[in-house]
Amino acid sequence: DIQSGFIANVGLNIFNQYVLESLDESIESIKPVIKPDIKLDCFWGSSIPKSYVDADSERIDIYKRLEHTHHSKVDEVKDEIIDRFGELPEVSNNLFITAKIRSVLSEKNILRCKIRESQIELFPVDLTEEVNLRIKTLDKKFIFRNKRLVLNFKDVLTPDSVYGILNSSL
């Protein structure tokens, strides 16, 4: 039998190669993105109190949305929640900032972060020349040893200031 059309023009082997490459691309595009489990220990509370959102299922949905939201889009989710449930209690506002921090940490492949009132400890960190220069512009002292970066500050940190530091320095 004589082949015609596209297969005849390119040959069966090349056609099979096109099909396999196309399948590889399709499979790659549907693979779930697995985010690493980030250990974040901070000194502020962050939650959605039952007094703010009564239904457990709605609170869980908000937590899930925040878990999968890029830090640049967290404020959009926050605005939706405020529109629906009213002004956020401080502990819930902290939750949205904490979600931004988690997203930045995930983006930078930092698996552990401990935040104290005047200190941020990160691990692991690859201290590139660019990151090193940005860190030196901050008003603080830092220690870098064994892929662990410890930033010490004079002033007490706020959730917003921690997010700003991590987003701009790493």
Describe the predicted segments one by one.
Residues 1-170:
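Accessory helical-bundle/CTD segments and flexible terminal tails appended to RecA-like ATPase motors
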